Amino acid sequence: MYRVAKASEYLAITGAGIDDIKLQKKAWIFPGQSCTVFDLSPVNYTFEVQAMSAEKLPFVLPAVFTIGPRVDDQESLLKYAKLISPHDRHSNHVNELVQGIIEGETRVLAASMTMEEVFRGTKQFKQEVFDKVQLELNQFGLLIYNANVKQLVDVPGHEYFSYLGQKTQMEAANQAKVDVAEAKMKGEIGSKLRVGQTLQNAAKIDAETKVIAMQRAGESEKQGIKVRTEVKVFENQREAEVAEANSELAKKKAAWTKAAQVAEVEAKKAVALREAELQGEVEKMNALTTTEKLKADLLSKASVQYETKVQEANWELYKKQKEAEAILFEKKAEAEAQKALADSTFYARKQEAEAELYAKKKEAEGIVTLGNAQGAYVSTLLNALGNNYTAVRDYLMINGGMFQEIAKINAEAVRGLEPKISIWTNGGDNSGGEGAMKEVAGVYKMLPPLFKTVHEQTGMLPPAWMGSLSDKSS
């Protein structure tokens, strides 16, 4: 006999020539074989599972499960054909089997959770029930197509879920009131904030425009200074080369003159030697002139940089003060005037402190730049004088007017004095003229200690015709 199953059915064939069970949609049924038709359509099972939480509080879990054979797995179909298909899908046997699995897994899971955990994590609780029930149904070849677990229900006499619902409703209502009040507050504050930000942005754009204009002017001035500095450095290099050539020529002339006058008398040798010394002094003056030009260039550049940095710092301070004043003016109009005034005052003081710190930093950078320029000037001067520290010190003292100041102080000390030296002598065994000369000689002997004091203070030696320093140590 030839049998054909419907679209939602399968043929389960057993008997002769078949080891276990053969599932087919259509087949010939031979003598000695048995054929059973079973339906694959899912069936809805409705339950009200009574469970108890970890605190021994009972509750009811209404649920509707749509369960049927797993059609995409041959092994599951074989299990279903063996275990379930002999019974009617709507029979008490199948219904009690499914209900027992669902109730057992639900009660075990609920017993491990508190009522609060069940209520707060309803979705997670339902998912865990679904997973555990499906795990048990797999051994029967069944699949949960859909599981609709309804809202948890109180057991009569226990009002736990209703009280939790009322609590949640009250919390939601209170939170809604808070949200409405907060939204109104944010709206009013946001309106004021937008007006303040508009004024701030306008002031900021104006300030940035002025800063950019000043930066462009400063860059142009810097380029001009750079070009003039390079030209000046080139001129100084050429002058140094000319001075070096003149020095070489003078040295050669001095050498030739000295060679030509070797046979001359000692007096002529002294004259030639003196001429060479004078030529050296001329070269030193040329080097001093070059150094003075370099000093002027470096100091002027450092001064320009210092003034530029100071102006930038002053403008930054002015901009920050105006922004702080705008913020303070807007904050005074808000509902919380005292708090806004304190915040804006703190912000203004902070910005003023930062601006003052920035100005101090720029001023310090200018001082450092000026110090570096002066150091370069002294280093160049020392190199030009052949690392002669004494000559550099004398030049700096002359250039700084120290000798003029010393002379002025000494002149002030003796101003108005009319020294008169009267020498009295009784004649004695010698004539009066000889005694007077002895006194004058005594005054002259006081000059070497005086010269020594001047030498210690200024480093200068007296002319040979005036005397020499005293060798005694006092």
UniProtKB/Swiss-Prot annotation:
Subcellular localization(s) per the UniProt record: Cell membrane; Membrane, Caveola
Tissue specificity of this protein: Expressed in all plant organs. Primarily expressed in vascular tissues. No change in spatial expression in root upon inoculation. Expression limited to the nodule vascular tissue.
Keyword match Coiled coil: yes
Annotated GO biological process: nodulation; root development
Lipidation (S-palmitoyl cysteine): 35
Assigned keywords, A-Z: Cell membrane, Coiled coil, Lipoprotein, Membrane, Nodulation, Palmitate
Family statement drawn from the similarity comment of this UniProt entry: Belongs to the band 7/mec-2 family. Flotillin subfamily.
PANTHER family the record matches: FLOTILLIN-LIKE PROTEIN 1-RELATED, FLOTILLIN-RELATED
Function: May act as a scaffolding protein within caveolar membranes, functionally participating in formation of caveolae or caveolae-like vesicles. May be involved in nodule formation.
Protein name: Flotillin-like protein 3
Organism: Medicago truncatula
Lineage of source species: Eukaryota, Viridiplantae, Streptophyta, Embryophyta, Tracheophyta
